[in-house]
């Protein structure tokens, strides 16, 4: 504890509040893409719009999905790779391939990679709880921008098939265009009343795009043959894996820290990402630590707390300040403390090399997604175990710290 106090005291030259803190993204920084009475899809603002320190996150976007019981996200595909993590609730995810279909029953803590272009649909199979799902998207076409394509058209977005000419569609499906239009595409002309009522009903449920209500029987049909994540293995090449499938890497009476790294999972290795889940009990502290290579995007799923991050002055400035920053590079850099209150739905980013500490004012759960995960090391600056300062040799401690080496080791 002495080391932690000495370390923080030596860097608290100045501090920034939540509003000036570029590392915290409050829940109101999510933009709503789709919303109706059945649920919503929200997209967090671009990381690099907050600060130039996040330039390496330009091609990463964070989405949140939430839906009511017995609802379905209609089939679609996106030009981005995804890492999907279930924050709460139960759901059935179906992923389609040219000659295959895989369905998975997901629950809290499950994660899975969805390759770019995968056609998927997602059903809430929980009778009471509203599942929350987090997606880290990595676009493959244009950095930082992703585009979704629906198999079935809606009132606000046409099916991707509707973009083709009549001749191409007739040749592809080996039938006349009127039949294709009736079965697969939205009707454009007047129809008999019995068909119009079916269309009107379809447009009504699709009025706000992609989230629709389904029956209990339909949910059971979707989930009955679905596979579940393995609780004993994290090495699945394509199926879901659970963040708590192995023992925590850190654990004591104050909390638990679970983590799955690329070395343990092929899906994560493909994208060079790690995923972790951290439980911190009320009144407890995650000791000051930093990552050597990884940039970690953290979402608060439950509870409240405070986080402190040590950075350098002007890291809250955007790209328009680059010239001014270049002029200041040769001046002394002021070390600065950034503070923020944490609440459910908040997101914060921990750049590589930036020490951070988190205090829980109620039982706190965090989900982290680490970019540049390969060969990353987490270094603690305080504590009895894994404390990197304890590895400093005695003569160096005498020179580096104001206290004696004995006092530093205490």
Curated annotation (Swiss-Prot):
Residue span of region Disordered: 223-242, 312-331
SUPFAM superfamilies (UniProt xref): RmlC-like cupins (SSF51182)
GO function term, MF aspect, one: nutrient reservoir activity
Span of domain Cupin type-1: 23-181, 241-409
Site annotation Cleavage: residues: 221-222
One Pfam family, short name: Cupin_1
Signal sequence bounds: 1-15
Biased amino acid composition, Low complexity: 225-238
Location relative to the cell: Vacuole, Aleurone grain; Vacuole
Gene3D superfamilies membership: Jelly Rolls
Keywords carried by this UniProt record: Glycoprotein, Seed storage protein, Signal, Storage protein, Vacuole
Keyword Signal (UniProt): yes
One term under GO cellular component: aleurone grain
UniProt-annotated glycosylation sites, renumbered to this chain: 359
InterPro entries, per database record: Cupin_1 (IPR006045), RmlC-like_jellyroll (IPR014710), RmlC_Cupin_sf (IPR011051), Seed_Storage-Functional (IPR050253)
The organism's place on the tree of life at top rank: Eukaryota
Family to which the UniProt record says this protein belongs: Belongs to the 7S seed storage protein family.
Protein's job: Seed storage protein.
Protein name: Provicilin
Organism: Pisum sativum (Garden pea)
């Amino acid at each position: 504890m002495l080391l932690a106090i000495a370390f923080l005291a030596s860097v608290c030259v100045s501090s920034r509040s939540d509003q000036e803190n570029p590392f915290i993204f409050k829940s109101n920084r999510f933009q709503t893409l789709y919303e109706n009475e059945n649920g919503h899809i929200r997209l967090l603002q671009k990381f690099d719009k907050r600060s130039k320190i996040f330039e390496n996150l330009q091609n990463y976007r964070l989405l949140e999905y939430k839906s009511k019981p017995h609802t379905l996200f209609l089939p679609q595909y996106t030009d981005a790779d995804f890492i999907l993590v279930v924050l709460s609730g139960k759901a059935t995810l179906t992923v389609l391939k040219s000659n295959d279909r895989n369905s998975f029953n997901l629950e809290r803590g499950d994660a899975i990679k969805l390759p770019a272009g995968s056609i998927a649909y997602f059903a809430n199979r929980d009778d009471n709880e509203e599942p929350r799902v987090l997606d880290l998207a990595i676009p493959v076409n244009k950095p930082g921008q992703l585009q979704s394509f629906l198999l079935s058209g809606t009132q606000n977005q046409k099916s991707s098939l509707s973009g083709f000419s009549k001749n191409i569609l007739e040749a592809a499906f080996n039938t006349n265009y009127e039949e294709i239009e009736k079965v697969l595409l939205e009707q454009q002309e007047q129809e008999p009343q019995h068909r119009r009522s079916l269309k009107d009903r379809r447009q009504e449920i699709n009025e706000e795009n992609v989230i629709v209500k389904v029956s209990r029987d339909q949910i059971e049909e979707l989930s009955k043959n679905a596979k579940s994540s393995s609780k004993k293995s994290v090495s699945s090449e394509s199926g879901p894996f659970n963040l708590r499938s192995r023992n925590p890497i850190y654990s004591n009476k104050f909390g638990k820290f679970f983590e799955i790294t690329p070395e343990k999972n092929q899906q994560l290795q493909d994208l060079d990402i790690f995923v972790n889940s951290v439980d911190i009990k009320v009144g407890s502290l995650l000791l000051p630590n930093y990552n050597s290579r990884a940039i970690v995007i953290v979402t608060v799923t439950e509870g409240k707390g405070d986080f402190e991050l040590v950075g350098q002055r002007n890291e809250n400035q955007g790209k328009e300040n680059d010239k001014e920053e270049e002029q200041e590079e040769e001046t002394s850099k002021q070390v600065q403390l950034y503070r923020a209150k944490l609440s459910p739905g908040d997101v914060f980013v921990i750049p590589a090399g930036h020490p951070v500490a988190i205090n829980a004012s109620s039982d706190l759960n965090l989900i982290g997604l680490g970019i540049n995960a390969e060969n990353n090391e987490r270094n603690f600056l305080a504590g009895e175990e894994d404390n990197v300062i304890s590895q400093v040799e005695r003569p160096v401690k005498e020179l580096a710290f104001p206290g004696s080496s004995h006092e530093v080791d205490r």
